[in-house]
Amino acid sequence: MSKLNHIVILTGAGISAESGIDTFRSEGGLWEQYPIEQVATPEGFAADPALVHNFYNMRRAALKTVKPNAAHIALAELEKGLHARGGSLTIITQNVDNLHEQGGAENVIHMHGILTSLLCQFCGHRWESHEDTSPDDSCIACQRRSGPRPD
């Protein structure tokens, strides 16, 4: 890899499972406990925003109990090494956790959103939040009630 200057790596559930993050599709995974259409679709959010907020509150709470593993840290070190010699590493992840960032990676793209981010369904403003949310919360930008949803 000494001649490679710009690398893109795709990661998925396996990298964070080692840290103790529940996967969605494995036996006993989250989709066995919560039907995807109820907690991870616009229709599910419209039908029962409280259920969706509670699901993501549970996921954020679980995230507070885990740490990045050796793979997250190794990718962050690779990124730093490439950057030092004028290169770059982009991590594209299917994961909604922030373990790549906690491990030190900076150039991370989350394909399916991120647990620690909210999106206002009215004005489109995004912001970081590690706290529990509810359907009664207001957007920090437009102040509209019931605006924030998981990103």
What is the meaning of each model-derived region?
Residues 1-151:
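Conserved catalytic core of sirtuin-type NAD+-dependent deacylases
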